[in-house]
Amino acid sequence: LFRIFHGITLYTFHSISYKKKVLQDIVRSKEKGADFIFMCMHAGGQYNLLPDRYTCNLMRFLLNTPLDMVIGHHPHCIQHIVKKKNKVGVFSLGDFCPYPKCASAELASPDVFPEYSIVFHVYLDENKVATNSFLQKKTFTIVKSIIGKDKIARVYPLYRLIELEKD
């Protein structure tokens, strides 16, 4: 959608008319030559381990459009992904750098692990756009946010933290 608007477009999905507008924009992006269309979806309840019905319906709607991938955020904890043919929908990658002891983090149940997040790696092959098989590989890295003695939050790959503990 960036190619159409050359900026950020915000949508509110609380009515059918907005869904129609989003669909028109996605179709227009394809018509203007977009090779890949990724959407960032800000939806879902904070610290919910599972997406709510509204968010699931929204994801289903988006994956039935010409979008290639939906990356969700807002719940502040990791949620699952869904696949539909060559498309991927990520409900929530977590809270990349939460600040423990902040008001919203205090509301989180300990079993949602808000200090952990996922960095999602997507490998594309632009030579396979015509066959719609350009999404070659998906991998991820688990990261953890840690507040240092200097009160600065730093994000570390979990594997690196495990290696540091061995030393």
Residue ranges and their predicted role:
Residues 1-167:
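Acidic, metal/ion-coordinating pockets
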